[in-house]
Amino acid sequence: MPKIEVYSSRYCPYCARAKNLLKKKGAEFIEIDVDQNPKERIVMERRAEGSTSVPQICFDGKLIGGSDELVALDMSGKLDELLISKGK
């Protein structure tokens, strides 16, 4: 399984949607709360090329985007491929 990092905020509905989808797929992920960890927000913004919106989701260090991009990957079947190809 890839190392999945989800930069999120506590009251963000898009973050909840992304995390729920990953949980539904049985994927383990590291949640990084950028509200509680301001230094992590800076890291997220660098990784996301300046984007300040959450969630920002990384698979094995590669940014895939936010909730909409994660859902699009799921709808196309590519999310399952990513999870399976990494040994899920």
Stretch-by-stretch model annotation:
Residues 1-28:
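Local sequence-structure signature of Cys/Sec-based thiol-disulfide redox active-site neighborhoods
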Residues 7, 35, 62:
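Anionic group-transfer/hydrolysis microenvironments
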Residues 16, 39, 65:
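Residues that form or flank phosphate/diphosphate-binding pockets in enzymes
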Residues 20-22, 45, 71-73:
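Short, glycine/charged-enriched secondary-structure capping and boundary segments
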Residues 34-51, 78-84:
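Thioredoxin-like thiol-disulfide oxidoreductase module
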Residues 49-58, 68:
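Structural micro-motif
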Residues 59-86:
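Non-catalytic, surface beta->alpha helical segment in thiol-disulfide oxidoreductase systems
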